[in-house]
């Protein structure tokens, strides 16, 4: 089944604009790269920028700087490590509360309700007269 479109806008194939240039590709790259930016105003992009965490090389990525130094990355972040985290985690909110108000036994004990809880019936609102 062949679909024929009579729309004049879809029938035309746009030519490559003259502002876009296709740089010469080396034999190591398999795909052509378009360059649409002005020359001499952008920083140099490095394909082999190294990322260091605590003085240890953790990854190689692309970027505008030669090396990056980070404090936390996925290899030592508690979210990615779960219980194997090497970082000291802060006490959760309950532990902070117990540490602060631990001597007050009245608020530390949770009351246990006995028997049935009877809620009073809701009062019906008076109908508005018009």
Swiss-Prot record:
InterPro entries: Ribosomal_bL28/bL31-like_sf (IPR034704), Ribosomal_bL31 (IPR002150), Ribosomal_bL31_sf (IPR042105). GO terms for biological process: translation. One of its GO terms (molecular function) is rRNA binding. GO terms for cellular component: chloroplast; ribonucleoprotein complex; ribosome. Residues 1-36 form a transit peptide. It is found in: Plastid, Chloroplast. Keywords: Chloroplast, Plastid, Ribonucleoprotein, Ribosomal protein, RNA-binding, rRNA-binding, Transit peptide. It comes from the Eukaryota. Belongs to the bacterial ribosomal protein bL31 family. Type A subfamily. Component of the chloroplast large ribosomal subunit (LSU). Mature 70S chloroplast ribosomes of higher plants consist of a small (30S) and a large (50S) subunit. The 30S small subunit contains 1 molecule of ribosomal RNA (16S rRNA) and 24 different proteins. The 50S large subunit contains 3 rRNA molecules (23S, 5S and 4.5S rRNA) and 33 different proteins. NCBIfam families: L31 (TIGR00105). Component of the chloroplast ribosome (chloro-ribosome), a dedicated translation machinery responsible for the synthesis of chloroplast genome-encoded proteins, including proteins of the transcription and translation machinery and components of the photosynthetic apparatus. Three forms, which differ in pI, are produced, L31 alpha, L31 beta and L31 gamma. This is Large ribosomal subunit protein bL31c. The lineage of its organism: Eukaryota, Viridiplantae, Streptophyta, Embryophyta, Tracheophyta.
